[in-house]
UniProtKB/Swiss-Prot annotation:
Subunit text: NDH-1 is composed of 13 different subunits. Subunits NuoA, H, J, K, L, M, N constitute the membrane sector of the complex.
InterPro entries given in the database record: NAD(P)H_OxRDtase_bac/plastid, NADH_UbQ/plastoQ_OxRdtase_su3, NDAH_ubi_oxred_su3_sf
Catalytic activity: a quinone + NADH + 5 H(+)(in) = a quinol + NAD(+) + 4 H(+)(out)
Disulfide bond positions: none
PANTHER family named in the record: NADH-QUINONE OXIDOREDUCTASE SUBUNIT A, NADH-UBIQUINONE OXIDOREDUCTASE CHAIN 3
Entry keyword set: Cell inner membrane, Cell membrane, Membrane, NAD, Quinone, Translocase, Transmembrane, Transmembrane helix, Transport, Ubiquinone
Protein name: NADH-quinone oxidoreductase subunit A
Family named by the database record: Belongs to the complex I subunit 3 family.
Record-linked Pfam families: Oxidored_q4
One Gene Ontology MF term: NADH:ubiquinone reductase (non-electrogenic) activity
EC number per UniProt: 7.1.1.-
Main location: membrane
Length: 137
């Protein structure tokens, strides 16, 4: 038996499954376009708000601080993922893996200290921070 015939014989179940999924999706899309309503109007292009016409704009202006917090969350979440993977294989990696994990943590801590020193993690406006510092003295 040739390689291509063996590959086809081995994966025929997956091919039938894939054809079934594509066929079911095409059937559901076709049925919804046939049976769905065809009415067009101004309200069709508006977002649904409990049957009420929308008032104002849906765009919200967010402070850049929220994006900074989201980026820090992603960075430290990935750090936790890498450290979890390291902790699973700590016996196999030995002291070399331990030193590599320490270097990884040190680099991330250096970045965190830099952000802290620059003031990227300060949420209060500078004037309010100065007033609070004067009150504490």
């Amino acid at each position: 038996m040739s390689d291509s015939a063996g590959l086809i014989a081995h994966n025929w179940g997956f091919a039938i499954f894939l054809l079934g999924v594509v066929g079911l999706c095409a059937f559901m899309l076709g049925l919804s376009s046939l049976l769905g309503s065809k009415a067009w109007g101004r309200a069709k292009n508006e977002p649904f708000e409990s049957g009420m016409l929308p008032v104002g704009s849906a765009r919200l202006r967010l402070s850049a601080k929220f994006y900074l917090v989201a980026m820090l969350f992603v960075i430290f979440d990935i750090e936790a993922l890498f450290l979890f993977a390291w902790s699973v294989s700590v016996r196999e990696s030995g002291w070399t893996g331990f030193v590599e994990a320490l270097v990884f943590i040190a680099i991330l801590l250096a970045g965190l200290v830099y952000l802290w020193r620059v003031g990227a993690l300060d949420w209060a406006p500078e004037g309010r921070r100065k007033r609070q510092a004067k009150l504490k003295q």
